[in-house]
Each structure stands twice: as C-alpha cells, then as structure tokens.
C-alpha cells in the first residue's frame, strides 16, 4: 500500500467519481467567460461569470442541474481535459493530466477550502459582471482581463 495521495498515483481515467470531484480546487476560473479570436484562435479571459456562479464561494449555485440552466456549460471529463485549452495552468485536472503535483493551496493539500481564496487563485472579489448582464457579445469586451488579473 502506498502512502501517496491518489492524485500522485492515479491518472484521471482511474479516479473514482468522488476523487474526480475533490480534484476541483473551487477557484471558479472555469466559470468565467472566455473569448476566442476567430482568426487566431487565441483565448482571452473576461471577468464575466456564469449566471450560476456564486462569486463569494466560487461554487456553482446549482451544480447538479447546471446543464439545464446553462446548456453550454462544459462538463470536464478525463477525455477532454487535454483538449480544453482555456483551463488555467493552476487547474488540478490539468496538473494531474500533465503528471504534475497540486499546489500548496489546493484544498486536498492544505486541508482547507479557504486557501485557494487566501492565495488569490480564486475569482473571489474579481467578478465584475454576470452573463445575464451582457446585452450583446461586444459587452464582454469591456470586461477583458489578463489571466494574472484573475489569479495572482
């Protein structure tokens, strides 16, 4: 038997549902809208959150039913983690897929769900609008940010 944590001994396809869910650090970055340049495919971050994101807890307000309310919500699965190029470099799913370890502030490492916020990684205090506030696509341009404005 190994004393190593599951994320150091398993790949994403080997995780139980509970392990998969616990890998989420609760940063909320995946719930921010991103823009993609049609010509270059470059991804641009915004500080506009999904209507279901609680900006204080950085958790989904209706996680079990999110696809019903937000049809384009992306369900992360082991099969698509490598294909989702907008996942933050700090994302635990991305880190495990790359064979890297989790950061000290990840709740599985620190033992506290608050460290992701204390470390400045989460979107707490950084959401400037919600998608239901946007009248048209151009409105998102007013909320463009660089990724370092989201995570310190």
UniProtKB/Swiss-Prot annotation:
Cross-referenced InterPro entries: Puta_zinc/iron-chelating_dom, UCP006173
Pfam families: CxxCxxCC (PF03692)
Superkingdom of origin: Bacteria
Family named by the database record: Belongs to the UPF0260 family.
Taxonomic lineage of the native organism: Bacteria, Pseudomonadati, Pseudomonadota, Alphaproteobacteria, Hyphomicrobiales
Name of this chain's protein: UPF0260 protein BCAN_A1514
């Amino acid at each position: 038997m190994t004393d190593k944590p599951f994320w150091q001994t398993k790949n994403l396809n080997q995780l139980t549902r509970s392990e998969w869910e616990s890998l989420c650090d609760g940063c909320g970055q995946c719930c921010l809208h991103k823009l993609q340049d049609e010509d270059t495919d470059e991804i641009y971050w915004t500080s506009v959150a999904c209507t279901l994101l609680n900006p204080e807890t950085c958790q989904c307000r209706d996680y079990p039913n999110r696809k019903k309310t937000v049809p384009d919500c992306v369900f992360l699965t082991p099969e698509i983690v490598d294909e989702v190029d907008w996942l933050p470099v700090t994302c635990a799913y991305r880190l495990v897929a790359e064979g890297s370890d989790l950061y000290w502030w990840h709740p599985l490492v620190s033992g506290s769900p608050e460290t992701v916020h204390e470390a400045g990684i989460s979107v707490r205090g950084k959401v400037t609008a919600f998608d239901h506030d946007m009248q048209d696509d151009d409105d998102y341009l007013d909320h463009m940010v660089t990724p370092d404005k989201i995570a310190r």
